Amino acid sequence: MTLVDRLRGAVAGMPRRLVVGAAGAALLSGLIGAVGGSATAGAFSRPGLPVEYLQVPSAAMGRDIKVQFQSGGANSPALYLLDGMRAQDDFNGWDINTPAFEWYNQSGISVAMPVGGQSSFYSDWYKPACGKAGCTTYKWETFLTSELPQYLSAQKQVKPTGSGVVGLSMAGSSALILAAYHPDQFVYAGSLSALLDPSQGMGPSLIGLAMGDAGGYKAADMWGPKEDPAWARNDPSLQVGKLVANNTRIWVYCGNGKPSDLGGDNLPAKFLEGFVRTSNLKFQDAYNGAGGHNAVWNFDANGTHDWPYWGAQLQAMKPDLQSVLGATPGAGPATAAATNAGNGQGT
């Protein structure tokens, strides 16, 4: 019996309210990682791109953090691409599942893909992040807003401010929160298929289930109990006023759970996208209500919780990113042997 069959059987005959809650809990707890999440065609960029594998010191986390990096040229702006809940420790999901480095080669934008951070929400946790693999320190916000930009500025001639940040699923809300609290660094934030009201309703409980499944982590170690102010602090729908006041350029995408020819025609991918769509519409209402006028909204007539849709959005936003960040297309090394290459599949 497949995972999807077990899910169908478990909810058969249940009242609709309980079906939605149970299915949402199951899917948000990581089943998408097991039965969905197909890669974009041509995943991993072609060999010969100037991609480097950096080991960036982090005093906040007490270790070096691997960052996949492609230069956009001297004094170029940066684009930080953040991974999903099941982020791996070998490569960033954007590289595993899409040819993102190839798409942005010669774009005038330096691309930085931090590696790791499973279930982290790219946040500074209250407590050590203890999971199935042991305990570590998660201070991702500090790393992304202080340590990494300082390193890239000093070592790679990347502008430390005026950057963009784009995340999918878990990291979509993270991208908006990073921009809300660090407006000089992140003038552009993209959220793709994210839950944008995580502190509200069943959000804390579902996130706790998801983190438990994706690595065995505890949400309370991250932001405390659901009544803790950290939950509201990291809720984009409650911090939308900051994005409006900052005049941050935002790009928000969410499908409706109906697959297109891009793929993702499986129950978890379809259900999860439909599940998070409501929070995206709610966020749009809050943004407009706060007087926001610097947003791109892509609420498509199709789209499931899957990489081909996120890859299409990253390609679509490229001209907008270049314009907002002031990139100079054509800047940066055209081709080079990858530094410390490790995946043998292109980067």
From Swiss-Prot:
Q: Where is the signal peptide?
A: 1-43
Reaction(s) catalysed by this chain, per the record, are: an acyl-CoA + a 1,2-diacyl-sn-glycerol = a triacyl-sn-glycerol + CoA; 2 alpha,alpha'-trehalose 6-mycolate = alpha,alpha'-trehalose 6,6'-bismycolate + alpha,alpha-trehalose
Which InterPro entries would you find in this protein's record?
Answer: AB_hydrolase_fold, Esterase-like, Mycobacterial_A85_antigen, TAT_signal
Q: Which Gene3D superfamilies match?
A: alpha/beta hydrolase
One of the record's GO molecular function terms: diacylglycerol O-acyltransferase activity
Which EC number(s) are documented for this chain? 2.3.1.122, 2.3.1.20
Q: Where does substrate bind?
A: 85-86, 169, 197, 275-278, 282, 305-307
| Highest taxon, organism lineage | Bacteria
Keyword tRNA-binding, does the record have it? no
For the region Fibronectin-binding, give the residue spans.
Answer: 101-111
- A cellular component term (GO) from this record? cytoplasm
Question: Entry's SUPFAM superfamilies?
Answer: alpha/beta-Hydrolases (SSF53474)
The task this protein performs is described as: The antigen 85 proteins (FbpA, FbpB, FbpC) are responsible for the high affinity of mycobacteria for fibronectin, a large adhesive glycoprotein, which facilitates the attachment of M.tuberculosis to murine alveolar macrophages (AMs). They also help to maintain the integrity of the cell wall by catalyzing the transfer of mycolic acids to cell wall arabinogalactan, and through the synthesis of alpha,alpha-trehalose dimycolate (TDM, cord factor).
Q: What is this protein called?
A: Diacylglycerol acyltransferase/mycolyltransferase Ag85A
Say which species the protein is native to. Mycobacterium avium
